[in-house]
UniProtKB/Swiss-Prot annotation:
Pfam families: Globin. One of its GO terms (biological process) is hydrogen peroxide catabolic process. SUPFAM superfamilies: Globin-like (SSF46458). This is Hemoglobin subunit gamma. Residues 3-148 form the Globin domain. It comes from Carlito syrichta.
């Protein structure tokens, strides 16, 4: 279990309160699909994913990105119990979607941190980045929990 300090929790919740989930979620998932094209196989029902511009403009990518980033809101509100907060999603990705748990560590969290940094600019200080990277790592661990 990952422990968050009061300062880290404050940093994370303060920034999260300013996040435009719809815009940021779509951008983060779009970047994931562009940078890691093998992940597109999990989204074969999304239609045209043939180019970066097609992906970034795809309404299904945007909608699912919003859904994914909304689940990150669960992480923000349940930092002290991520394993239980993500138990259902972990089971879904393990038992039904068969997503390799390595994908949780390598891909989505990094894209989200990059997109947050892009959107918040100077406000995304090294301390903010460190807190968010810690949260993303903890979410990856929670998402991979049912695989063990």
């Amino acid at each position: 279990m990952v422990h968050f300090t009061a300062e880290e929790k404050a940093i994370i919740t303060s920034l999260w309160a300013k996040v435009n989930v719809e815009e940021t979620g779509g951008e983060a998932l779009g970047r994931l699909l562009v940078v890691y094209p093998w992940t597109q196989r999990f989204f074969d029902n999304f239609g045209n994913l043939s180019s970066a511009s097609a992906i970034m403009g795809n309404p299904k990518v945007k909608a699912h990105g919003k859904k994914v980033l909304s689940s990150l809101g669960e992480a923000v509100t349940h930092m002290d119990d991520l394993k239980d907060a993500f138990a259902h999603l972990s089971r879904l990705h393990c038992d039904e979607l068969h997503v390799d748990p390595e994908n949780f560590r390598v891909t989505p969290g990094k894209r989200a941190v990059i997109v947050l940094a892009h959107h918040f600019g100077r406000e995304f200080t090294p301390q903010v980045q460190a807190a968010w990277k810690k949260l993303m790592s903890a979410v990856a661990i929670a998402m991979g929990h049912k695989y063990h």
